[in-house]
Amino acid sequence: GEFGPVNLIQENFGSYKEFDMENRFFNPKLAGGALLDIGVYSLTLARLFLKSQPHDVLSMMNPAPTGVDQTDGILLRNAEGQMVVLALTLHSKQPKRAMISADKAFIEIMEYPRADVATITWTDDGKQEQVQVGRTADALAYVLADLEAAVSGDASAQAQLAVSKDVMELMTSLRNDWKFLYPEEQ
């Protein structure tokens, strides 16, 4: 496209959740942990900008006292050499920021799980453009509309299923690398 090929994607997503080991964030019986709670957003956004599924997956995870992943560092690379760097945490606030770097521009998306604006910076002259689409307050309505479209047979909505499958494979690979199983998987 007009930005050139995407080379690198960097994403941060950090929330500060109090250590309440019974709540959904840290309780393994409730599928707690950073990967399933917030990582799914980061991995999905990255996969949408990649030409193919990453084949190199490296990561480190720090567990919460319950054993679920509290903080994750994830590095991905696909066959085209596109790389992704993710930093996720449930116990340290950081901006929800995505940076998609291409040959001719980079795109910055703040609050990306519910963003309604992105900033494009052209690398040759530093010129910036803002793109605004939708409303943050309507984020869940958009998810429901996409689900309804996919169920009703809309081909473009069903294409998202391939992305979702890739994201699930990545999350399973990461959990396997960490040797982390939820109680019902043991």
For the regions a language model picked out, list residue spans one by one.
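C-terminal helix-rich "cap/oligomerization" subdomain common to oxidoreductases
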Residues: A79, D146-Q186
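Contiguous beta-strand/loop segments that form the cofactor/metal-binding neighborhood of enzyme cores
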Residues: T44-A115, G134, A145-A155, E185
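Predominantly a Rossmann-like dinucleotide-binding segment in NAD(P)-dependent oxidoreductases
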Residues: G1-V57
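Active-site loop of classical SDR/Rossmann-like NAD(P)-dependent oxidoreductases
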Residues: V131-A145, A159
